[in-house]
A protein has these predicted regions:
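DEDD superfamily 3′-5′ metal-dependent exonuclease/proofreading module
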Residues: 1-33, 42-303
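Short beta-strand scaffold segments in enzyme catalytic cores
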Residues: 38-40
Length: 303
């Protein structure tokens, strides 16, 4: 087994210790495939790679990285589905006790969860690198160019290529944290000395539900009107808006919120509707309109 070290110039976006993880394997089977390469980037910029040079070294590799992953906050791209379960399954295969991480953050899962408030349409790492203008200097131009290799193919023909690909996967996963931060900032509402942070927006039939948190803490609160209800418990809020589905213009089907309370903002959608009709969803959420509705309702509570 070999170990490679490097240092990457990064800033600690979260002001806490974390690692960015990516693995390369010989296939998708957790029984018949092996972990070939593990890349780890620490929040202080230290980058380390472990790669097996013999078929029997996987067990040693897993023992080594288990110590690095235990009790850590692990950031991945699709790692909740692939990387972390794969590592743990291979550890169990070798009779090892799988590590227990502190927590995980899967960037791909996060972006899919928030897809209706962004204009992101494709969620492969390569497509997101293009979307967020992240560079990758290696011979693999497309995700499909990276095949699963047998150990002999990996060792004899593609060793350096796979190591480089893994390194860029790790580094560019880190760079996608900047996109995550931009999305999180777009969901914040500042009102007086308070910050209202939207966590999720969903709709079902005639109800648009918005969940989030308020800081600093405020007292519990509940109010219900003709077209909305708001519940605040332990500074977490749930706002339900009554919405209607209809054609906003010829061929454009969407949802609007009908308001009967004063609104002092301009509709950000391109549709010329009555002033009491605020578009909230057409293929994607109109986040600006939704934030303004939230802000208007909270103005009577946070003074």
């Amino acid at each position: 087994m070999i170990k490679l070290n490097d240092f990457i110039e990064i800033s600690n976006l979260y002001n806490k210790k974390y690692i960015v993880l990516d693995i390369e394997t010989s296939g998708v089977s957790r029984i018949n495939s092996k972990v070939l390469v593990v890349g780890i980037l620490n929040s202080n910029g230290e980058f380390v790679q472990y790669a097996i040079t013999d078929k029997n070294e996987e067990k040693t590799l897993l023992e080594t990285i288990s110590l690095l992953l235990k009790d850590k906050y692990i950031i991945t791209f699709n790692g909740d589905i692939f990387d972390i379960p794969f590592i743990k399954s291979r550890m169990s295969y070798h009779g090892q006790k799988p590590f227990i991480e502190k927590s995980t953050f899967d960037i791909r899962k996060y972006l899919i969860k928030n897809k209706y408030i962004t204009d992101i349409e494709r969620f492969s790492l390569k497509e997101l690198e293009i979307y967020h203008d992240i560079k990758r200097f290696e011979e693999f131009e497309l995700d499909s160019d990276v095949e699963f290799y047998t150990f002999d193919e990996f060792k004899n023909e593609n060793f350096e290529k796979v190591l480089l690909h893994n390194k860029y996967d790790v580094i560019n996963t880190y760079y996608l944290l900047d996109l995550v931060n931009k999305i999180e900032k777009s969901k914040q509402i500042h009102l007086n000395d308070f910050t209202i942070k939207i966590d999720s927006i969903t709709h079902d039939k005639n109800i648009l539900e918005i969940n989030g948190d308020i800081s600093p803490e405020i007292m519990d609160y509940f109010v219900e009107g003709n077209n909305f209800s708001l519940s605040i418990v332990n500074s977490s809020f749930q706002l339900k808006l009554y919405i209607l589905e209809g054609y906003l213009e010829t061929g454009v089907l969407g949802f609007v919120h009908i308001h009967n309370y004063p609104l002092d903002f301009v509709d950000e959608s391109p549709y010329n509707l009555r002033k009491d009709l605020i578009p909230v969803f057409v293929n994607r959420y109109y986040l600006g309109n939704i934030k303004n509705i939230v802000k208007t309702i909270f103005k009577d509570i946070i003074k």
